[in-house]
Amino acid sequence: MIKKIMTTCFGLVFGLCVFAVGLLAIAILATYPKLPSLDSLQHYQPKMPLTVYSADGKIIGIYGEQRREFTKIGDFPEVLRNAVIAAEDKRFYQHWGVDVWGVARAVVGNIVSGSMQSGASTITQQVAKNFYLSSEKTFTRKFNEALLAYKIEQSLSKDKILELYFNQIYLGQRAYGFASAAQIYFNKDVRDLTLAEAAMLAGLPKAPSAYNPIVNPERAKLRQKYILNNMLEEKMITLQQRDQALNEELHYERFVQKIDQSALYVAEMVRQELYEKYGEDAYTQGLKVYTTVRTDHQKAATEALRKALRNFDRGSSYRGAESYIDLGRDEDAEEAVSQYLSGLYTVDKMVPAVVLDVTKKKNVVIQLPGGKRVTLDRRALGFAARAVDNEKMGEDRIRRGAVIRVRNNGGRWAVVQEPLLQGALVSLDAKTGAVRALVGGYDFHSKTFNRATQAMRQPGSTFKPFVYSAALSKGMTASTMINDAPISLPGKGPNGSVWTPKNSDGRYSGYITLRQALTASKNMVSIRILMSIGVGYAQQYIRRFGFKPSELPVSLSMALGTGETTPLRIAEAYSVFANGGYRVSSYVIDKIYDSEGRLRAQMQPLVAGQNAPQAIDPRNAYIMYKIMQDVVRVGTARGASALGRSDIAGKTGTTNDNKDAWFVGFNPDVVTAVYIGFDKPKSMGRAGYGGTIAVPVWVDYMRFALKGRPGKGMKMPDGVVAGNGEYYMKEHMVTDPGLMLDNGGAAPQPSRRVKEDDGGAAEGGRQEADDESRQDMQETPVLPSNTDSKRQQLDSLF
């Protein structure tokens, strides 16, 4: 009877086992073909950030959530490989993807506990989970994980699997992979890890937060001890090595990626361009982008601009705290302040600080980054003293929780503030358009708005050279006489009223030459020139310099620069004068490398005299250059002559009520544009002239940029002749002084003979017939805008 019962039980158990094996086999056969392809493992491309470099190899920007550095398995030290294997998978080199004995132990433990508490996942299974599966704790997921681990083991070598694991695993503090973790936790190369450090990092995969040695040092130490004991048990280390490692004092030095702060606007331009092309993939492919700017040029440009903005703001009243945070209880304040300040940047030696307390004597206690506390007395508060607990200033007053800026002046801290006035500087290689320096404002961190590329402002008189160039193309010369006298134009003002423009200084000189008029920036002369050549013709002609039609108002006010453009666009346009008449497009991306260091793309720029389109007659460019040299020598930009160079030319610009100030200066190699103005346009007062505030910025930067470069000037092109103390296109050379425009802007027929080889009298007559105006526009070829040309270049780059 008992034997029969035992036989029956055995049969049932055996049957159940067979049934279970059958079900397992069916499950395997049904699931295995549906497992994902291993292409992502066989062609592993880890998510690596976009890194932007200057031309001299300095990092100027890093973009991407995951901080990872791909490392070959052979470059990880043996001590780290052993530590990880001892911690995560002792039988890694023996099993086929799943550790059967480990699974058996886990199953027993899970049955006893009644839940999925232990997973016994091998390194291969963790690779399967990290790349393909979720983190949910279910038997289905574990089953798929085991099958996928087996598939991985059949396709990849053990070292390749380990390489994937070492580079992909998340280890806390935004570190992905052990190479990145070595930098972030210990600020050292992974190859330089000690045994103690390796064992500490090897404890992180199990639970990065729980075993973070910075946040939970005691738990992390216990985990390290467990791993070292495992290594000893597996004969990976000796007892002496274990004890030394346990007694080693570890120093955690948080790695901070050093990003050069001088070119943040340039780095952001690159980020935007690559994001537009690649989308979110731009931040994960590990691209390394080299730009055209050098950090030394960037620093010189940044300091030149900041100096002018600081000087203008000197003497201004204190505008108040820049922000406010709620500090809550005293015991929580220090931690809250430290966390808040860690997200702020020191700019121009202006250190962010948070007010902790205001004493009865109205001294102010502040906390600096790093936790240091400083008490500011009335002297240290300076111009900000009136803002201390001043209810009239409302939210801007200095009170507990206020965020202010301070500067250390020889050991004494004092309250300072960032200037409200803003500006931009753009410097280009005149022959290629390569950006040599670009600064889009005082502080990138406070406002990422790039005034060099995004601020659409009136260029004022810096636009006049384009009108004068159009006049030369119509037959006027630098010696043409124009009447600098007041003018009233019925129907040309707002709502059809009379337009009565004026010279900025209110003075008029009568008949003067075109050269004299541009040198002195005479508004009346510019208007009469435009009346003479026709607005339609001028607009079409000026588009050759890269301006869009929307930037060129179809009215006489165009002569005064009432359209809107950006500092970058105006610098590009002036490069036509500087390089002999060729249109080049600005660019900041020079080369792009992939994550493995292979050259992926390189800019092939348009080069003046080679493949760049001819925008204007080279003789026209030369004569305009010679005229604008006088602007620097004796005109509104004579402050630029402080460089002591004879090859400099340029033009200042100031808009109505001194709201915008400009200077664009150049020689045949470099074009630099400077713009100054408030983000919300308002008058800068008497100091807000281009020659007063913009020229000094240009001088400070160009003194550095042109250091060591000889001043050769522009070579005179064929077809230009000198006579009567002036330069002429050969066919427009006259024996007597220049033609004269009458008060209406029309040029009378010359009373003297033109040279025999002129081919006809100088053009310049007033365009009154519609047919003639249309003919003028047809004779003026229009090149693609600089935006179109730049897009074509970038498309070829990518």
UniProtKB/Swiss-Prot annotation:
Family that this chain belongs to: In the N-terminal section; belongs to the glycosyltransferase 51 family. In the C-terminal section; belongs to the transpeptidase family.
Record EC number: 2.4.99.28, 3.4.16.4
Biased composition (Basic and acidic residues): 765-777, 788-798
Highest rank taxon of the organism: Bacteria
Functional note: Cell wall formation. Synthesis of cross-linked peptidoglycan from the lipid intermediates. The enzyme has a penicillin-insensitive transglycosylase N-terminal domain (formation of linear glycan strands) and a penicillin-sensitive transpeptidase C-terminal domain (cross-linking of the peptide subunits).
Residues that span the membrane, as ranges: 10-30
Catalytic residues (positions): E88, S461
Subcellular localization, as worded in the UniProt entry: Cell inner membrane
Membrane topology according to the record: Single-pass type II membrane protein
Pathway named in the protein's UniProt entry: Cell wall biogenesis; peptidoglycan biosynthesis
Gene3D superfamilies in the record: Biosynthetic peptidoglycan transglycosylase-like, DD-peptidase/beta-lactamase superfamily
UniProt-annotated stretches for the region Transglycosylase: 50-218
Region Transpeptidase: start-end pairs: 378-700
Catalytic activity as recorded in UniProt: [GlcNAc-(1->4)-Mur2Ac(oyl-L-Ala-gamma-D-Glu-L-Lys-D-Ala-D-Ala)](n)-di-trans,octa-cis-undecaprenyl diphosphate + beta-D-GlcNAc-(1->4)-Mur2Ac(oyl-L-Ala-gamma-D-Glu-L-Lys-D-Ala-D-Ala)-di-trans,octa-cis-undecaprenyl diphosphate = [GlcNAc-(1->4)-Mur2Ac(oyl-L-Ala-gamma-D-Glu-L-Lys-D-Ala-D-Ala)](n+1)-di-trans,octa-cis-undecaprenyl diphosphate + di-trans,octa-cis-undecaprenyl diphosphate + H(+); Preferential cleavage: (Ac)2-L-Lys-D-Ala-|-D-Ala. Also transpeptidation of peptidyl-alanyl moieties that are N-acyl substituents of D-alanine
Residues on Periplasmic side: 31-798
Annotated GO MF terms: penicillin binding; peptidoglycan glycosyltransferase activity; serine-type D-Ala-D-Ala carboxypeptidase activity
Gene: mrcA
Region (Disordered): 739-798
Protein name: Penicillin-binding protein 1A
Any Pfam family: Transgly
Keyword check for Coiled coil: no
Record keywords: Antibiotic resistance, Carboxypeptidase, Cell inner membrane, Cell membrane, Cell shape, Cell wall biogenesis/degradation, Glycosyltransferase, Hydrolase, Membrane, Multifunctional enzyme, Peptidoglycan synthesis, Protease, Signal-anchor, Transferase, Transmembrane, Transmembrane helix
GO biological process: cell wall organization; peptidoglycan biosynthetic process; proteolysis; regulation of cell shape; response to antibiotic
Membrane topology, Cytoplasmic segments: 1-9
Gene Ontology CC: one annotated term: plasma membrane
